């Protein structure tokens, strides 16, 4: 840290290293206490930041000792007093002694001393820059006053330049020319009036006898690098926090730096402008810079401020570095102020001096650095005329925006009305569609009944046939087909549509007789020519097994019918048992009929029947456990071990009457090639997927309102309410008795409802009237309460009035909610595409799970969320992404399945229980209104209200019933429990699935585009074109990231820097040389931004 010697050949660089010498022998390490003391002393000399000090303090003792030895090997060459004494001797032209004065008189001797002074200044600059902080503080202390000495020498070195400038000024008078030196050296440091006395001792006192010699010596000094090196010394001092504060508080220092612009060396001028620009960016520095140029104007005789600066800028067009520094300084001094008006003023100063015209000439300059600084200034220009036009345009835009907002509000209202109307129409159409489907199903059943009965067995009066009979033959035929598929029976068809059934023997163990009753083997024949047979007897009796009964006729009861039922009226012949009524699915098989059941002679004894319930499925479930019409599923053996889909499967007994009875996942698996699916989703070492717990809806419980009112507070609140109503007590009571809602207002009525007289208050009022006390004793609130309590049926009237006011809004609010529930429920239940989507999901889930958990016959809707959690082996896609691709390739007609589902989001936001409660509340209110009208049938308000709103109430009741039935039906249809499933829970499952499906579609499409782009990119190099153009953006990516980070930081950090640390001035100079200054127009605080055109990295 302590080079004390510099090099004359390298003025701005570090000191020349001394010749290499062998390292001295290492000294032994002292004791720990002494080592720590010497280490702390070395750290203090280094002037390091706290983080570096903390880092070095963590060194071990060996490294600390090496650091101490390195620090102590370096010795400062000269103390600060030596440099100060030499500088004083160069400036002291008055002569400390006659010998010194005589030496100054010799021109040859002075030139020799100038050479020596230049070398001394270089060594001083190196010492100020490299020595430890203690050396610098000693140089600047009150005893040495190194800053004052340095400024005296700087003023002496450039006084001749100022004098020559004034001598060549055509407008100067002779009297002014006779005293240039006094003005140039004493008035340089003029500052504020309070600081003038303080600055007088810093100026050079030249007598008339010595002035000519001093000017001659100053000219010799100014031709050397002394001014440049002096500025370098001041820059080194300002790089320390204490030195910067001393310079900024000095009344003449910045003035002398600004006057150094008159130096002939362009490199010195550029150095001065960089230093002044950095000072301008420090808090309070801008005012000091402007004061320095005011002083410059006075000393140099300018007519306008910055006149000489613009003259140098125009004339020094051969030195690009100076022009860049000059343009940078002008940009910062103009646009770094926060006051916009002051900024315009400074901008016009340079416009008046011809800057804009000169920049137009420099527009085609070849220097990139200069072009960047010029463009930064042009970008910062504050155009008042354009701002005025923008203001006028903004006002017009604001007015237009208000109009557009009004139009948007109007269109939004119209859209909401149109949406409600369309929702009502869709709900009505869904209800009509549902009714039409029911009628179609009824017609199909009648047609099936008539076809199954045949012309010979058809009863003469079809209307007397049992309504539920048509459903039995189809179930019987289904059972026969099922037994045939299982290989338990064989159907033989003979000539003349004769049908016989042969039971195939199965070697099984004898079943136990009581747990699950075994249905008899159902047989059926569509032919009417078959002779009637007795009811089939189930094979659940203990061995030996009973003989199998014959085939029953189509009009006979199925096996589950109870025996000994009376015959139906109007039948041609009485059947042995009546058919089961109703449209419900067939119940489980009943116990075997008694042995006395009538019937034809049975055929010869068949082989023993199969065990009860048929063969078990993969999980050991028999047919009796699967439910009627449910076919047992076999587990699927996959090639690879598949992960388990975490769905909630339904039991076979739970799918009766649901959508899953209509799904055939085995057909889907036969249509798809699952080998690709296995490859992408086979198990790898992966954690178990999250198990979605069953969601439970909790009814919101309203906290009971507490109303514990003290009498005084109640009276005070009543007074406030009456003031809001702004009506007298008698007028209020008359309006209540006449049901005049317009006079009272709904809000006022709701407030009055809180002040209905209590039993205690009524007793007080009764006693007051019985005692016949004067009304004057009562307050205004009490008199109102007295009048208020005299209204007959007051609670009923107040409730009716409140109901009259709330009914239209409440009905208008409830109707769209009911329509949303109806439309959403019916559209979900009637969507064939949604059923096919669920069929595909069921197929894939069984393909993954059946080998371990057995085949599932259905699943909970919440299992759809698990599709997003199941990841492929490479973790790049989910099961939902794969399903989207399969549907797009194999089932393209299903891609828009969500277009069949209406108003799911609106229906999901409806609380059906609350809506139904509100409807019931409206119904009770309407009934109360009707009772009031019966008691007061001459009231036209009640009569008109009942006439206008009774149809609305009837429609609300009908829609609420339809909505409740539709919702419960669709919930049960999908295997959920309507008692525990709310609309918000049910419809949100579909909404989430649709959103996830759409997002997966977009991602799959994006993947396809990226894959196509990669393929196209892979084909391009094969055409002989190297992919070189793509390399520069990749190479510049770190630089662009740095620029983005700089912009992000600088948008958060203000422009005004704080000089609260060492090295701040160097950092500012580095920043402004690297990053062009850009001011945000219209912002109170400017910002530094980084232009992408600069290829340099900015140190932070």
Curated annotation (Swiss-Prot):
Domain FH2 stretches: 632-1023
GO terms (BP aspect): actin filament severing; cell migration; cortical actin cytoskeleton organization; regulation of cell shape
Membrane topology reported for the UniProt record: Lipid-anchor
Gene Ontology cellular-component annotations: bleb; cell cortex; cytosol; extracellular exosome; membrane; phagocytic vesicle; plasma membrane
Tissue-specific expression: Expressed in heart, brain, placenta, lung, liver, skeletal muscle, kidney and pancreas.
PTM comment text: Myristoylation mediates membrane localization and blebbing.
Keyword Lipoprotein tagged: yes
Keywords, sorted A to Z: Cell membrane, Cell projection, Cytoplasm, Cytoplasmic vesicle, Lipoprotein, Membrane, Myristate, Phosphoprotein
Region (Disordered): 1-31, 167-200, 446-474, 510-635, 1008-1037
Record lipid sites (N-myristoyl glycine): 2
One of the record's GO molecular function terms: actin filament binding
Biased segments, Pro residues type: 14-28, 539-615
One Pfam family per UniProt: Drf_FH3
Domain notes: The DAD domain regulates activation via by an autoinhibitory interaction with the N-terminus. This autoinhibition is released upon competitive binding of an activated GTPase. The release of DAD allows the FH2 domain to then nucleate and elongate nonbranched actin filaments.
Role this protein plays: May play a role in the control of cell motility and survival of macrophages. Plays a role in the regulation of cell morphology and cytoskeletal organization. Required in the cortical actin filament dynamics and cell shape.
Self-association and partners: Interacts with RAC1, PFN1 and PFN2. Interacts (activated by RAC1) with SRGAP2 (via SH3 domain); regulates the actin filament severing activity of FMNL1.
Protein name per the record: Formin-like protein 1
Organism ancestry: Eukaryota, Metazoa, Chordata, Craniata, Vertebrata
Gene that produces this protein: FMNL1
